[in-house]
């Protein structure tokens, strides 16, 4: 996984890692992981951090070494690519770029894709529309897309 990173990325990660490796022993504590990742432009939730730590900290000693950290960052970078794809897809549906997909916009895109769905479009909106405002915002869109 880490072999997909560029030399520049690796040196950027090494620099960030070193900043938090206070005693220079080649390990950072799990508590510091969130700070390191945020400094690199990632924004993991507490739950995501805990999942990452559980995956990486094999011996359960509460520290993460640099090779483990690189694998973790490579995985996160891969996830970020799919996030960009989702944003792009959302923009395609959100014709007026107001941050929401209306039933009319969804119907328009589906028709252009050769789908003649009227009841189905309303049903899709109802399923995805968590806050009940009759439109799909980006968070709702991501939930629907990730559920597939």
UniProtKB/Swiss-Prot annotation:
The modification N-acetylalanine is found at residue 2. One of its GO terms (cellular component) is myosin II complex. The modification N6,N6,N6-trimethyllysine is found at residue 116. Disulfide bonds: none annotated. Ca(2+) 1 binds at residues 21, 23, 25, 27, 32. Ca(2+) 3 binds at residues 94, 96, 98, 105. Signal peptide: none annotated. Residues 8-43, 44-79, 81-116, 116-148 form the EF-hand domain. The keyword Zinc does not apply. GO terms for molecular function: calcium ion binding. Keywords: Acetylation, Calcium, Metal-binding, Methylation, Repeat. It comes from the Eukaryota. Ca(2+) 4 binds at residues 129, 131, 133, 135, 140. Ca(2+) 2 binds at residues 57, 59, 61, 63, 68. Pfam families: EF-hand_7. This protein has four functional calcium-binding sites. Calmodulin mediates the control of a large number of enzymes, ion channels and other proteins by Ca(2+). Among the enzymes to be stimulated by the calmodulin-Ca(2+) complex are a number of protein kinases and phosphatases. Belongs to the calmodulin family. This is Calmodulin. It comes from Fagus sylvatica. The gene is CAMF1.
């Amino acid at each position: 996984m880490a072999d997909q990173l560029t030399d520049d990325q690796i040196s950027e990660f090494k620099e960030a890692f070193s900043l938090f490796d206070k005693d220079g022993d080649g390990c950072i504590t799990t508590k510091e992981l969130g700070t390191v990742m945020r400094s690199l432009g990632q924004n993991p939730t507490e739950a995501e951090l805990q999942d990452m730590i559980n995956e990486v900290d094999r011996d359960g000693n509460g520290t993460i070494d640099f090779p483990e950290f690189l694998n973790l960052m490579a995985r996160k970078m891969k996830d970020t690519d799919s996030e960009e794809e989702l944003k792009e897809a959302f923009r395609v549906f959100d014709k007026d770029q107001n941050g929401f997909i209306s039933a009319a916009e969804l119907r328009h895109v589906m028709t252009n894709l050769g789908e003649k769905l009227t009841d189905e479009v309303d049903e899709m909106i109802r399923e995805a529309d968590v806050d009940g405002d009759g439109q799909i915002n980006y968070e709702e869109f991501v939930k629907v897309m990730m559920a597939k």
